[in-house]
Amino acid sequence: MDGVTPTLSTIRGRTLESSTLHVTPRSLDRNKDQITNIFSGFAGLLAILLVVAVFCILWNWNKRKKRQVPYLRVTVMPLLTLPQTRQRAKNIYDILPWRQEDLGRHESRSMRIFSTESLLSRNSESPEHVPSQAGNAFQEHTAHIHATEYAVGIYDNAMVPQMCGNLTPSAHCINVRASRDCASISSEDSHDYVNVPTAEEIAETLASTKSPSRNLFVLPSTQKLEFTEERDEGCGDAGDCTSLYSPGAEDSDSLSNGEGSSQISNDYVNMTGLDLSAIQERQLWVAFQCCRDYENVPAADPSGSQQQAEKDVPSSNIGHVEDKTDDPGTHVQCVKRTFLASGDYADFQPFTQSEDSQMKHREEMSNEDSSDYENVLTAKLGGRDSEQGPGTQLLPDE
C-alpha cells in the first residue's frame, strides 16, 4: 500500500508542473496586449491634446492679427537720468466764461435789431409811408390838434433881426394839410416838418377863390411862427376850424427829387407836441416873429383906406406887434393886423401847373379892381427913407 501511495503523489506533481508550463506563455501574451492597449490610449490622448493646443494657438494668433495696436507699447521703464519733457503752457483764455461772451454778443445784436425795428415801426405807423394810389397825384395829411401845445417855427438861412407879437384868433381847431409832392426828405424821415405855401401861391389861390369876406395874412419867407394851442370846449365845432392846403407840382417826378420841396418853398414848420392836461380853458395864441417891421399901407390911398381898415378890425382879432431889437437905428412901432374871423373857414385847395396862366390872369384882374394892401417897410435903417420891402406881399381886403 505504501508503494502505491507515492506513486499517486508523484503522478499528481507531474501533472501540476505540466499544467503550469502550459499556462505561463498565455498569460504573458495577455499582459503584452494590455500594455500595448494602454500605450495606444495614452498616445491617442496626447495626440488629441496636441491638436487642441495647436488650434488654440492659431486662434489666438488670428485674434492678435485683427487687433493690431497703432502705437508701440512701452514695456521698459524710462530712465531717471533723462531730462523730463517741458510742460505745455496754460492758455489763460480758457478760464474766461465763453457763455457770457456769447450772451454779450447776442445782446448787442438784439439792441441793433431793436433800434431797427423801432425805426421801421415808426415809419410804418406814420402817414408819410402809406402808398398813394396811381390816380391820386396829391396826398393830404391832416394833423388834428387837441389839448396839446405845438411850437411851430419857420426857419430860413438868413440871419436877420426879429420882432415879437401876439395875435388872438378865435379858431379852436387847426388842420395843417400838406401835399405829398411838396414833402421834403427831412419830412419823410422825421415827420416833424410841414411845408407852408409861399406868398405868391397864396395870392394866386386867393385870386382864384374871389371871396371878399376873408382876411388872410401872407407870411414872408423870413419869418418865425410859433403856435401855442390848448384845448377848448368848442373845438368840435366844424365852423371854427382853419385848414391850410399846400399846393404842389402835378407830375409825380418831384417825389424822386429831394430838393423839389426846397425849390417850391423854403419854409418849414417844426411841430413839437407837448401835453397840457392841466390847462384846458385857454384859447389859441399865435406869435409872429418877423425879421423886419412892415406896415399895411393901401396901394391907392394910404391915408383913407388904412383908417378904414383899422375901423373894420374887430377887437377880438387885433394883435399888437411889438418890435424889440438891439439896433438903435431901428424904429419901434405897433402894427395892427387882422386875422380870420370866428365863422370863416379858410380853404386853400391845391392847384396844378395847367391852371397857372388862369391864376395869374385872375390875379391881375383882382389887383386892378380891389383895393389890396401892400406891405411897405417903415423902419428907417441908416438914415434911409421908408422903402418898400424886398418881399412885397399882397393882402386881400375884407
Swiss-Prot record:
Classification via Pfam families: LAX (PF15681)
TM segment ranges: 38-58
Entry membrane topology: Single-pass type III membrane protein
Tissue: Expressed in spleen, thymus, and peripheral blood leukocytes. Expressed in several B-, T-, NK and monocyte cell lines.
UniProt keyword Transmembrane, yes or no: yes
Entry's Gene Ontology BP terms: adaptive immune response; antigen receptor-mediated signaling pathway; B cell activation; immune response; intracellular signal transduction; lymphocyte activation; negative regulation of MAPK cascade; negative regulation of T cell activation
Residue spans of biased composition, Basic and acidic residues class: 320-329
Induction (free text): Up-regulated in T-cells following TCR engagement.
Cytoplasmic membrane side: 59-398
UniProt biased composition (Polar residues): 303-318
Compartments reported by the entry: Cell membrane
Keyword list, A-Z: Adaptive immunity, Cell membrane, Immunity, Membrane, Phosphoprotein, Signal-anchor, Transmembrane, Transmembrane helix
InterPro entries the record matches: LAX
Extracellular membrane side: 1-37
PTM summary: Phosphorylated on tyrosines by Syk, Lck or ZAP70 upon TCR or BCR activation; which leads to the recruitment of GRB2, PIK3R1 and GRAP2.
Region (Disordered): 228-261, 298-330, 347-398
GO cellular component: cytosol; Golgi apparatus; membrane; plasma membrane
Protein function: Negatively regulates TCR (T-cell antigen receptor)-mediated signaling in T-cells and BCR (B-cell antigen receptor)-mediated signaling in B-cells.
Subunit text: When phosphorylated, interacts with GRB2, PIK3R1 and GRAP2.
Protein name: Lymphocyte transmembrane adapter 1
Source organism per UniProt: Homo sapiens
